[in-house]
A protein has these predicted regions:
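Amphipathic alpha-helical interface segments
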Residues: 1-126, 146-185
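Carbohydrate-active enzymes and regulators
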Residues: 139
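Long, charged low-complexity segments
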Residues: 129-136
Length: 185
């Protein structure tokens, strides 16, 4: 249960960070770029908090049970949806903001991060049916929902969650660097 304790501590920190991000996004900013940065950051912090919450639910559920698969489908859905947003919009905008602030090395590493995880993101497409039928977009035929959940491979789902955690950790460092950079330095 040491892992669960660490996740609960991480969730507590993520909650504090999220609440601070909410305060930051609602204050007056010196520029449109700063406002947009805080909006992108709160999106990251929301996902970060949700990921900790989801992992706690997964670990609390008995392994190799239907309940565990239901817990896993939640994080798979979150990762599936977020990967589209982060790769199609957020990374692109953060690169622009980083260039505006002169953080060229960080922008290069941000692009490398996306390249490093391209195959992982592509592999998440296998969860489209799960997403369409049993997570947020529930099929009217309950047996279709159940079948989609039953097909979840726990080991593969946990591997995706761990890869996502690695991506988020590296992304957090780069996000922080862009946030701290100032134009013209």
């Amino acid at each position: 249960m040491e892992t669960l304790k660490k996740l609960e501590e991480g969730r507590s920190r993520a909650e504090q960070i999220l609440n601070q991000a909410y305060a930051d996004v609602n204050r007056q900013h010196a520029s449109l770029e700063e406002t947009e940065f805080h909006r992108l950051k709160i999106q990251f912090d929301i996902i970060h908090f949700q990921a900790f919450s989801a992992m706690i639910s997964i670990l609390k559920a008995e392994p190799h049970t239907f309940a565990r698969k239901v817990a896993l489908k939640e994080i798979l859905h979150m990762i599936y949806e977020y990967k589209g947003t982060v790769t199609q919009h957020h990374i692109w905008r953060l690169c622009q903001l980083g260039e505006y602030k002169g953080a060229y090395d960080t922008v290069t590493r941000l692009r490398e991060l996306v390249r490093d995880f391209r195959d992982e993101f592509k592999s998440l497409d296998e969860y489209k049916t799960l997403r369409d039928k049993a997570t947020g977009h529930y099929d009217q035929d309950i047996s279709v929902q159940i079948a989609a959940i039953e097909r979840i491979d726990e080991d593969a789902a946990l591997a995706h969650a761990l890869a996502f955690a690695e991506f988020q950790g590296r992304f957090a460092v780069l996000l922080r660097e862009i946030g701290r950079a100032t134009p013209g330095t």
